[in-house]
């Protein structure tokens, strides 16, 4: 007969979560709170994890960007990161990094999804809606679609 399992300590739970993927401080606090006796216990553990560099909001933000930047625009990624209470410094750095690569990322997403200029206004609207829903700005989407139209007008094959 199997022995009953001992409940995991708060530290073991935290390390288990962090061993699977990066977490923000707020996300880890939310996951650990039901298992702690007090809020102070959770905060002390989170402070210790940050001191040991096992928990880092900056690393978490980089992880989210690395996982999702190839599919989503700056607006959508920033909205997701804001829900994790990262702080203005980390968000500012990430936003600057994302805006610098927004055009290239949007072009790659557009080419993967559509690959050719819109044939009519309905298709153009569909492409714009798709790209804006992915978090790309209307200005960037317009430039990409206009660039594709220009290629078609020149008689070249779209890239």
UniProtKB/Swiss-Prot annotation:
Keywords: Cytoplasm
GO cellular component, one term: cytoplasm
Predominant place of localization: cytoplasm
The organism's place on the tree of life at top rank: Bacteria
Its job: Modulates RecA activity.
Protein name per Swiss-Prot or TrEMBL: Regulatory protein RecX
Family: Belongs to the RecX family.
Keyword Cytoplasm in annotation: yes
Location(s) in or outside the cell: Cytoplasm
Biological process terms in GO annotation: regulation of DNA repair
């Amino acid at each position: 007969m199997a022995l009953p399992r001992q409940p995991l300590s708060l530290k073991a739970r935290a390390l288990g979560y962090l061993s699977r993927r990066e977490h923000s401080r707020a996300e880890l606090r939310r996951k650990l709170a039901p298992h702690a006796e007090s809020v102070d216990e959770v905060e002390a553990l989170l402070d210790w994890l940050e001191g040991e560099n096992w928990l880092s909001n900056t690393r978490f933000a980089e992880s989210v960007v690395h996982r999702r930047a190839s599919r989503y625009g700056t607006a959508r990624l920033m909205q997701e990161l804001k829900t994790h209470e990262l702080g203005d410094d980390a968000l500012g750095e990430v936003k600057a990094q994302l805006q610098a690569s927004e055009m290239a990322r949007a072009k790659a997403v557009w080419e993967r999804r559509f690959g050719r200029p819109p044939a009519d206004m309905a298709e153009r609207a569909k492409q714009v809606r798709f790209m804006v829903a992915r978090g790309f700005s209307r200005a960037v989407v317009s430039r990409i679609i206009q660039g594709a139209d220009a290629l078609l007008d020149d008689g070249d094959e779209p890239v």
